[in-house]
Amino acid sequence: MSVLINKDTKVICQGFTGSQGTFHSEQAIAYGTKMVGGVTPGKGGTTHLGLPVFNTVKEAVEATGAEASVIYVPAPFCKDSILEAAFGGIKLIVCITEGIPTLDMLDAKVKCDELGVRLIGPNCPGVITPGECKIGIMPGHIHLPGKVGIVSRSGTLTYEAVKQTTDAGFGQSTCVGIGGDPIPGSNFIDILKLFQEDPQTEAIVMIGEIGGSAEEEAAAFIKANVTKPVVSYIAGVTAPPGKRMGHAGAIISGGKGTADEKFAALQDAGVKTVRSLADIGKALAELTGWEVKKA
């Protein structure tokens, strides 16, 4: 088992023939992802990377039976792309793009929720079930099929947690980057719920960052609902208030959203927190009693 995606998930790409869409689709195909086609308006009827190109998502879904779509489209057009996928019959939308206007995302998220469509992102690395399916921009080779579910607001910090769990021999069930924007399509709680219900996931790593209250809300959810061991790291311990730290959502405002507040909430929920990213693998081993693979 895994969450969201597996080896049978049929995936299309919106923005398929663009440079980003082309590069990352090639990587996904090489990884073994079941890519079945792509969408670029005006190029329908042609082929690209040996796969059919369609003018619309609806046509692509009807012809291929696609269930998931990954979006590599410039920010001003992302809202339309997300809505087209949602109304076109796609059940899982993964939007990688950064810089989408907040009001656009608000609208897109509400529509996806109404339609029962799962949206991951934007401004995220995507989703991967190691050895089976890769939807997004993460490096496939650092992943190992295994038993740790990873959910994160940061892309590169996810890769660090992945590398440590791979090196330790624990591996990952599924890794989900929820993105660093103020309005994510799916939040920590949405993904924690899936990991809690997934029999393959035996432990969870949650990587948060300063800004907003997503981690505090996740802590309350963990305290009430999650029985699996959880290790967490919060980025931005030394961040000054009022300064945006990379992501649009990573800002301490009105004295709220500091790393210390988040660490405290998580510790209160029984989560094992680490102050250094380098300690994630070690903390997992301590919490679970798993044996670390010798290098």
From Swiss-Prot:
Role noted for this protein: Succinyl-CoA synthetase functions in the citric acid cycle (TCA), coupling the hydrolysis of succinyl-CoA to the synthesis of either ATP or GTP and thus represents the only step of substrate-level phosphorylation in the TCA. The alpha subunit of the enzyme binds the substrates coenzyme A and phosphate, while succinate binding and nucleotide specificity is provided by the beta subunit. Can also generate UTP or CTP, although it preferentially synthesizes ATP and/or GTP.
Family: Belongs to the succinate/malate CoA ligase alpha subunit family.
Binding residues for substrate: Y159
Listed InterPro entries: Cit_synth/succinyl-CoA_lig_AS, Citrt_syn/SCS-alpha_CS, CoA-bd, CoA_lig_alpha, NAD(P)-bd_dom_sf, SUCC_ACL_C, Succinyl-CoA_synth-like
The protein's annotated pathway: Carbohydrate metabolism; tricarboxylic acid cycle; succinate from succinyl-CoA (ligase route): step 1/1
One GO MF term: succinate-CoA ligase (GDP-forming) activity
Oligomer status and interactors: Heterotetramer of two alpha and two beta subunits.
Active site feature: H247 (tele-phosphohistidine intermediate)
Binding-site residues, CoA: T17, G18, S19, Q20, K43, I96, T97, E98
Pfam families in UniProt: CoA_binding, Ligase_CoA
Top-level EC class: ligase
Keywords: Ligase, Nucleotide-binding, Tricarboxylic acid cycle
Signal peptide: none
Annotated GO CC locations: succinate-CoA ligase complex; succinate-CoA ligase complex (ADP-forming)
Top-level taxonomic group: Bacteria
PANTHER family: SUCCINATE--COA LIGASE [ADP_GDP-FORMING] SUBUNIT ALPHA, MITOCHONDRIAL (PTHR11117:SF2), SUCCINYL-COA LIGASE SUBUNIT ALPHA (PTHR11117)
Full protein name: Succinate--CoA ligase [ADP-forming] subunit alpha
Reactions listed under catalytic activity: succinate + ATP + CoA = succinyl-CoA + ADP + phosphate; GTP + succinate + CoA = succinyl-CoA + GDP + phosphate
Gene3D superfamilies (UniProt xref): NAD(P)-binding Rossmann-like Domain (3.40.50.720), Succinyl-CoA synthetase domains (3.40.50.261)
EC number, as in UniProt: 6.2.1.5
GO biological process terms on file: nucleoside triphosphate biosynthetic process; tricarboxylic acid cycle
